Amino acid sequence: MVRSRARVLDAVASLLVEKGVRGVTVDAVMARSGVARATVYRHWPTRQALVLAGLRHLLPPPVPRTAADGTLSQRLTSVLGGLARQMEVEPWAHAIPALLDAARREPEIATVAARFVADRQAPVRAVLQEAVADGSLPRLDVETALAQLLGPLVYRRLLTSEPLDEELCAHIVEHFLRGQSSQVTRPLR
């Protein structure tokens, strides 16, 4: 049973890379994995569950939450750096754009995409919320802050060939915090 699950997950992952989300059908997975339809449905009752399992198998797990010690700048740079390292993994370049594109057309895939994005935003969101709670940052729109911090990483990964590195992450955080500094009740660094 474990081997058939692994074969299915390997098949889904390879289909995601080669053909995108649209290429992940139960028939395609059965053909690629050699696993029976009943076995596929026993473990993944919906296509959505199959795609999500394939993404989890293909891509690294979300960045773990950082320790609460260190400056706000260090904590934000750390979580952005972890996300940037994940985004440099090759399957990311193939699977994520396909996932986001399919999410626009398929409601069940939109749920998968939303969960995937939320999982990756969570560590950054937690650092921002803690900083607002302890006065290190002024009250802010967390969604806008997430876009300001994560947007440059996504832009660079999807639209340029420039690397995602610690220096970039530190630069993004520095500019974000500089923009927040006029409203801060405690020192940012």
Region locations from a protein language model:
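Basic, helix-initiating cap at the start of DNA-binding domains
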Residues: 1-32, 38, 49
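A short His-aromatic
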Residues: 41-44
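Amphipathic alpha-helical segments used for helix-helix packing
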Residues: 51-55, 87-114
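Short, basic, alpha-helical segments at the C-terminal edge of helix-turn-helix-like DNA-binding modules
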Residues: 55-61
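Hydrophobic alpha-helical connector segments
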Residues: 63-93
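Amphipathic alpha-helical packing segments from all-alpha helical-bundle domains
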Residues: 70, 74, 94-97, 107-133
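C-terminal peripheral helix-coil segments that are non-catalytic and often amphipathic
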Residues: 78, 122, 126-133, 138, ...
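All-alpha amphipathic helical-bundle segments outside canonical DNA-binding/catalytic cores
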Residues: 111-116, 132-148, 166-167
